[in-house]
């Protein structure tokens, strides 16, 4: 499942070639984690450490999950590709780096493309031993968990071999919508012969019209997010760490009026929707969004939860081009996110300084 949209003419800020090369490297299966980004990746746009985690910057130094010794108290920005900073022109312009600049403290990116709420928690458990004193943990997330609810239904829909192959192809099209920046390789003679004699088949995609109603999937996703947040709360209860959940922004949930660059970007996406667009396409209704957040907040109690889709409009630059696709941001957008988060954390820390930790609910 891809989280990247194909750059289109007139987009607010097309995703850089480095992101496309980075994602075309794919993801490796590793024990206990579903996705692992390329380790030690180097480019002018995105760089990762020995664990595949992106670097953030503070005061001229870079820090990461694998390289945080001597950073003092650290803070974590947890989530998927938005928290990772896909769309930023360089590591210095991710949300984590902007939070470091605004707060004067080190913020690390504990994020990976495609991770759902449970996988985010598992990623923390995998690396928890690397962290010293934790100040704040901000989970900027929600949409991957929702998208995977549709994906689960697709995979469970049929056991017919032909349809199963289509479903497998759906999963394996990780790079759909990502332009290939590498030069095309000349096909071997055997490949040319096989292509010549093979029957012509149109690309198969699983049908999405048999999915359960969107409100049902949103409810299940909200319950999953709420359970995971209560587990986070229990894990961090003895560490005097502030935990906050922020529902990540989705363009249709954020805006009623689009700036020109984002209008052009959406026109391009309409011609070539990504897997992620297919999985979330029936969830863009604002009433569904409101019910989704309310249920997350109810299920996550007492973890403080906020909705960036509502808060982002408080930014002075909200009317400008911020999105590079429906869920990723350019540099100005990441800076706006960081400023809103900083302001909201100042309120949340005082209000939720003393929290009781309830037992994790079952079901």
Segments and roles (model prediction):
Residues 84-86, 109-110, 218-222, 324:
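Second-shell loop/turn segments in exported
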Residues 1-75, 130-133, 352-363:
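N-terminal secretory targeting modules
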Residues 109-111, 247, 307-309:
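Residue-level recognition of beta-strand->loop/alpha-helix junctions
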